[in-house]
Amino acid sequence: MNSLKKIILVALAVAISSILIFKENSLVAKLTFPVQAAVSQSLSCATKPDIPWLHTDGRWVKDERDNLVTLRGISFCGFNNEWGEKVLPDFEHKIAKVTDETNGWYPNILRLPIKNYHLDTFSLEQVYQTLQAGVDECARQKVYCIVDWHVVDGEKGADWRSPQMQQQTKDFWRYMAPRFKDYPNVIFELYNEPGYPKLVNAENWLNWRRTAQEWVDIIREQAPKNIILIGSPLWSQITRFAPKYPFTGSNLAYVNHTYKGMEESWPQEIGLEYDWEEVFGKAADRVPIFVTEFGWQADSEWEFGKGTTANFGRPIKDFLNQRPNINWIVWTYDSYCSPRLADERDRVLGEKKMGLFVRDWLQEEWVKSTNPVKPCSTCFADLLNSAEGK
């Protein structure tokens, strides 16, 4: 990336010099005068452009000019350290690590999880202050962020069907949505992983929709513009029903989570193999999809996620690269969750772990046209295209 920046600076210098050397009616001058007129725009790339509001349109996310957008990034795990829910996450500090280009990280979105049982220790206002620090840091770094209500059904008795969890979810969004409604970089993730019942059928999806639609409405009434991400039962795996039975509302997208080993939890009686194309690929042909969790680690402590770059990382990369309308977020940067990108000293993990592979992948994606926060390289390319009348 550093060599690319040097090339861009040299190209700018040559363009400006040519204006002084060539006559106004020369071919080179005709190409470079528009560039000179837009030099200030190019230089503004060095400070990163403002983040545009996003919206959904068909199967795509788009920016305010209707440019196609793909969001690709990293999730934190919701804990600050081994003390778990007894300490709120230090998002501001974490974000600085993974948006520093000198560290080689190039996400355009970060996921900020808040566990439901954080509220056993902290007030909604305290949780909001923690999230606000993270959201503000993301805004400063010009990256999008997901405010993630990170309930995992089955964890400490959580169950989306219980009156207690339904009330807690409504309380959370009534508090958070109006406070983040004016942030163009904020996306809301409704409920991380509804778990039960473990059925892959339309009835299960429709029962979930009947309950969760009220939560969507609460957010939309308070925050009319922010995209809302909607999961599904079986820990956000029955995404395939979203196109036929969508939720009501604007700027909605649907979530899938996938890990090595999830095929073992996939009900065999439905007569359908666990296959990315069937699980969420076909849905992505019709509605916007965010894979807000996936990852792999050969020695993962977790029952799911035990995979290698060869048997999971490269296949999922190939699958997602063929479908640029699917947005994706890798789980997780933090060393005290699994699978992980880095260790406790922020050393990026390689070999059979995913850190180096994902970091290189994000660098590749950063310069693509679907990145809504364009880097300097694409800013200058746009200027040249403009000068050539493209």
What are the language-model segments listed below?
Residues 1-11:
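N-terminal Sec-pathway targeting helices
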Residues 9-19:
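Hydrophobic membrane-insertion alpha-helices, especially the h-region
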Residues 19-31:
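Membrane-interface motif at the C-terminal end of an N-terminal transmembrane signal
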Residues 31-109, 360, 378-389:
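N-terminal carbohydrate-binding accessory modules
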Residues 53, 78, 87-90, 161, ...:
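Extracellular glycoside hydrolase catalytic/binding regions
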Residues 88-154, 166-169, 218-222, 309-321:
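Aromatic-lined substrate-binding rim segments of carbohydrate-active enzymes
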